[in-house]
Amino acid sequence: IPSRNMDNETKFMITCMLFTAICSSASSAEWKATVVKSIDALVTSCVVVPCSFSHTGGNLPTSRLRGIWHEKDDKKSNIYHEDYTLIENNFKDRTQLVGRLGQNNCTLEITGVKDHDNGPFCFRVELVRTENNDPTKDMFSFVDNCVELKMLPEPAEPTVIKPMTATQGEPYTVTCSVIHTCPTHVPKLTWNLDSTKVIVHHKDIKQGNWETQSSLTVIPEEKDDNREITCTAEFNGGLKSSETFTLHVKHIENYNHIIIPAVVGIGTALLFGIPCILMAKKYK
């Protein structure tokens, strides 16, 4: 009997330990945030920091959640807060959440980027009571998942992809693209050529990076040979960059100056030659 009791006690203790381990693991796993570690930020422009999270409160509407972004070294130094008075003066009117907290989206936008906005910045979530909007004890700062901004004083030049040579009278397509980190205010790509066929695409290339692409199609003429074509990218905030290349047009030989006189000559010969032959046969 004692051994049976010992077996039961051992089984019970093992069960409790397993249950505690599982609960602890599940609890810690519920407070999670996914934030890019580093992202480029063009000075004077804007940057959008992708962020998603999970919490212990289950499915809650945005009104029951409070999202805060703060400096890593000082949780009270808020760069974004729904209470405007709690935002650091340097960041007032420059930050907003572009994601919906109720959809576990904590994506942050910073506009008018300054060269000292480098961070690191961390996200904090608080569960609140709807009746008075006071935070509950359920809150978490994701200080192990923060973002640092890599400051860019100048924008990168656009990338141009093109065929080496254009053919006179045939469609010629060239593509200009630029990488950026502000999908809420995308760069504007323009050409120094007029064309009714310009197609623009925007593509998410992950980790907070986006690509804006402009494809230009023209039908070059002989006069366009050695013409310089420029693609200009204008970023939010006014900074610009450009890329220029020289268009080489392959000429199509025109043989009309040979064909037309030959046809005229043959026609004239036939016009006057045939009656002469007929008359010669008649009087022969």
Give the role of each language-model region.
Residues 1-45, 118-121, 131, 147, ...:
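N-terminal Sec-dependent signal peptide, specifically the hydrophobic helical h-region
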Residues 18-33, 70-75, 138-160, 192-198, ...:
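Flexible inter-domain hinge/linker segments at boundaries of tandem extracellular adhesion modules
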Residues 47, 116-126, 172-174, 187, ...:
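Conserved Ig-like domain signature around the intradomain disulfide
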Residues 50-54, 173-179:
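Short edge beta-strand/loop segments characteristic of extracellular beta-sandwich folds
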Residues 54-94, 131, 182-202:
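N-terminal V-set
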Residues 59-62, 130-144, 239-244:
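Beta-sandwich strand segments
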Residues 259-284:
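Single-pass type I membrane-protein transmembrane alpha-helix
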